[in-house]
Amino acid sequence: LYRHNEQAFWQAIPRNAPGVIHLMGELYGLDEIKPRKILDVTPYGVAQAETFKKEAGNPFREDGRKYKLNGGIDAKIGITNNMTMDLTINPDFGQVEADPSVVNLTAYETYFSEKRPFFIEGKNITSFNIGLGDGDSGNDNLFYSRRIGRNPHGHADLEDGWYADRPNFTTILGAAKLTGKTKNGLSLGFIEAITAEEKAEIDTGGGRIYQTVEPLTSYLIGRVQKDFKEGNTLLGGMFTSTNRDLDQNLGSFMHKSAYTGGLDFTQYFNKKNWMFNINLAFSQVAGTKEAIAETQRSSARYFQRPDNDHTEFDPERTSLMGNAGRIQLQKQNGHFNLMLCSIWKTPGFEANDLGYMQESDEVLSVIWAGYHVWDPKGIYRSYNFGGDVYVVNNFGGDITGKGFEWNGNMSFKNYWSAWTGGNISTSHPSTGLLRGGPMMEIPGNISLRAGFQTDYRK
């Protein structure tokens, strides 16, 4: 009932419940229903016309328009009632919503959410998160599907008077995905994708030449997870691999191969009121000395910092290894909630070939507590408040972040609401502010926020 903000459920689920699925009702007595085996094959063809501003002298843009024909096949096959295979050849993502424009002045890559249906379906089983919350580390994951079909890594090497036509994305030659969950609680997720070698076409004024800007690449993702004891125990693992067919130019800054893997364990206690979770991950990248030197100098680790005394920049390396993990204990039911968490990534951990991360060489420790009241009383309908204390340090013992965060929200009986929050950060050294230079002290700061909302029903 929208005007009263009320909902009716067949099986009532308490507001303070530690979950939803395990509290849902069960329906019995439906017999003689035979599910249809799925077999959908969808060929497609696309005629594309692109217009842009004319550019005099540029043979690729002097007409102000470009035409393209494309085609491919998508297929969905029901292996069993609970297991589905998706296949695609030269998929068409032309109708997918475009990413928003972003001005990024940081040293870190912008994270974009996935919008392509092929990768969205079954996304939960192919995920292996090694971050926490919705902050900078919240997106850290061993699999970031936007890597497949991404904008090419390389750029055309042009001389004066030369013009280039460079592709904006990498063609996915073919991909296969198997996802599902068996009756005995085994979840499976496998993806194999092959992306094409992409070349930039260059007009030299006297002819046309081609330069490779993205190599032929094979991506593999494998994820399994098993439920035990009516879903109170979960044990899983993940493995990813990236293998590239590199030429000499691309081999100077791209990894020849990259592998990551992990194990995860989750245990619920006391009717799911308490949860313990541990995720462990490893990474190994290999390539030329120049490529691994680029990795050591990247914004994720800055091994070349002059005051870096716990890691060493080695220009002779041809591989880099590291590990990461998260240990978490959480109370997630009742009025009072609590979380203790520690996350780490060693200096050599690197997941950006097929995953996503911003920084390695860090340890984040957090203690969070919150209180929630749902029973109306006086002028309010409900309220909640919470706060956390956090400390960030690197593996050299430098405290690179420390502070306290809080937030609160109150909903009133007239359906207005108000909220407040803030952050107190102490002064601390930054290892990345000078982007490879020495550490620099950042002064402490206090930030506050507050707001209110009128009756949302009007």
What kind of region is each of these model predictions?
Residues 33-54, 116, 120, 138-149, ...:
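Transmembrane beta-strand segments of Gram-negative outer membrane beta-barrel proteins
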Residues 53-59, 99-102, 156-159, 200-207, ...:
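Outer-membrane beta-barrel translocator domains and adjoining extracellular loop/strand segments
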Residues 171-173, 179, 258, 269-458:
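Exposed, low-structure sequence patches enriched in small/polar residues
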Residues 35-86, 219-311, 368, 375, ...:
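Surface-exposed extracellular loop regions of Gram-negative outer-membrane beta-barrel proteins
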Residues 139, 144-181, 318, 329:
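Outer-membrane beta-barrel transmembrane strands
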Residues 19-34, 79-83, 122-132, 177, ...:
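Outer-membrane beta-barrel proteins
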Residues 1-41:
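Acidic/polar low-complexity flexible segments
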Residues 84-148, 175-188, 347:
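Outer membrane beta-barrel
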